[in-house]
Amino acid sequence: LQPDSYETITNKALELTKVEKYTDAFATIEKAIRLKPDYPQAWNTKGDILINLGKLNGAIKAYNMTIKIIPDSDAFEIPRLGKIKYQALNKKGLAFVRNEQFENAAAEFEKALKIDPNSYATWLNKGLAEVRIGKLEEALTAFDRATTLKPDSYEALNYKGFVLEDLGRLQEAVFTFDKAVKVNQNFIAALNNKGLVLDKLGKHEEAIEAYNSAIQANPTFDAAWLNMACTYSLLGERDNMLNSLKKAIDLNPRYKMTLQQIPDFQNYRNDPEFLKLSGR
């Protein structure tokens, strides 16, 4: 490559980005764009630099230029151009997420997946965006695709379990959280979530087992201690409830402020020991 070619200048901007010299990188990529305004990689790089500078709206505009320059026909027929357009669509979606424009984000991820339908990360991000706009069935489809592409993704399985719970499909949610735990036995979030769903199903003893497993994996997991206290309260096991609650508060003193509002503790709201723990 010629030292003053637009490709060379774009590569220089990329190198400056790697060493976090974003202001210099921005000035450099602007030179490349002036030399070749229809060079999609330069616009993609500009978008990346603007993301790192915290200028999300500018980044979205830069990615839009990449998307505009590469026709859909070329994106589907020419792998190199398809990859660049896919990256621009995906990164534009991520920028929308950071701007909390989740509907726009989901739409961009959808477009990106038409170019590369086998991207685990994009299916996962699409699912998360759909959850934020309340489209649970679409989110479930996205998480299903993510777990098909990457069956050992306990993260995607956990999100899928959340959606199933919100859809009222509680037994399926428990099964899905179990799958996440089989992949990662120390995945405390899935163990805790499994316990919460089991409580909803009235399976309180099994819920206790799930919370205990989470605590064994991480004894400082305050949410599991609190949830276990709630379950012991529902079972009428006062001493176990108080012991678990004390541990939760020791780990997270902010719980004191909300104890009186938690319905599961209604039978103990006037209990002297409970009142002491809640700071009354």
In which residue ranges do the predicted regions lie?
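Conserved alpha-helical positions within TPR/SEL1-like repeat arrays
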Residues: 7-17, 41-52, 78, 83-98, ...
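TPR/TPR-like (Sel1-like) alpha-helical repeat modules
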Residues: 63-71, 233, 238-255
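Terminal, low-structured helical/coil segments at or just beyond the last alpha-helical repeat
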Residues: 76-83, 254-280
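Short coil loop/turn residues that delineate tetratricopeptide repeat
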Residues: 4, 38, 72, 118, ...
